[in-house]
């Protein structure tokens, strides 16, 4: 599959802006990215990693999140136990467990390599509880999204050759029929 990188940038931006807006993210919250550049390029996950594709996607997403004051956490593959690259400032502020690994294309993946290159002071953390996220290429980001997870159907379900899904989160509804609830900015009730 031959990708048009300008189109990839435009489509990435459209998808991520859609998910940011519909997930009702606020300044200071965390957004997870799961990315298989192999899937984006039309291959199988983990088999055809592309640093170029990873950098394009992470750069676009970082720009959109940064302009809104939202933090990015980039999930790695199972070879790094799905650890995440975040800014050191976030890890310190949230008292996250920092782990020692430097990602490469086949241990961490192209998204993590790009995050290490593009972030100000990147570190790997063992786990995180994020408010929303996007999964490009069926990498399974659910373990990093807080409860209650709300699936969002992206404006486009594909990016290149990759399947795209997204999750937001909302507070638990407790109390049953007698309870009243505040409005839900995600589902609009």
Swiss-Prot record:
Bridged cysteine pairs (disulfide): none
Any one Pfam family match given in the protein's UniProt record, by short name: DUF436
SUPFAM superfamilies associated with the record: TTHA0583/YokD-like
InterPro entries registered for this protein in UniProt: Antibiotic_NAT-like, DUF436
Gene3D superfamilies: Hypothetical protein TT1679
Entry superkingdom: Bacteria
Entry's family note: Belongs to the UPF0340 family.
Name of this chain's protein: UPF0340 protein SAG0103
Biological source species: Streptococcus agalactiae serotype V (strain ATCC BAA-611 / 2603 V/R)
């Amino acid at each position: 599959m031959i990708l048009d990188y300008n189109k990839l940038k435009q489509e990435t931006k459209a998808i991520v802006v859609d998910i940011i807006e519909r997930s009702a993210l606020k300044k200071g919250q965390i957004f997870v990215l799961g990315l298989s550049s192999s899937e984006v390029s039309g291959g199988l996950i983990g088999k055809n990693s592309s640093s170029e594709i990873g950098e394009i996607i992470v750069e676009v997403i970082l720009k959109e999140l940064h302009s809104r004051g939202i933090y990015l956490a980039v999930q790695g593959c199972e070879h790094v136990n799905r650890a995440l690259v975040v800014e050191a400032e976030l890890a310190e502020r949230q008292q996250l467990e920092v782990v020692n690994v430097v990602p490469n294309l086949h241990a961490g993946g192209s998204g993590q390599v790009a995050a290490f290159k593009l972030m100000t002071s990147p570190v790997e953390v063992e786990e995180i509880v994020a408010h929303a996220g996007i999964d490009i290429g069926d990498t399974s980001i659910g373990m990093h999204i807080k409860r209650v997870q709300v699936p969002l159907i992206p404006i486009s379900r594909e990016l290149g050759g990759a399947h795209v899904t997204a999750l937001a989160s909302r507070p638990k509804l407790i109390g049953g029929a007698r309870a009243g609830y505040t409005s839900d900015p995600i589902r609009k009730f």
